[in-house]
């Protein structure tokens, strides 16, 4: 399968921005043309680029890196999901502190992370790659 789209898909406060930036930099270092060049502001924009550009792009030098905070389908064409997982207790604390929100919203973010992990563990192992936040944090 010719994968040209990498999806960073997880909840906020789990290292997703770090993974997004590192993925883009590794591809650039490998002399791959990383798209989109202008970073979209919303999930909708990422999906539009995926549908209108990535799916029809036959240039093997082009790779698309998308970052969204929602669970993806198990069968996106030409795609691979990269997802981060983190101790839900740490997600709850981090979300509350950095997002300046109440405890119930932070608890929901932690529960959402468990849902991502539960669902993504049912997907084909060649389609999803897990990155533990604690490993990112300890080796950076």
Regions found by a protein language model. Name each.
Residues 1-63:
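PAPS-dependent sulfotransferase catalytic core
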Residues 61-140:
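PAPS-dependent sulfotransferase catalytic domain
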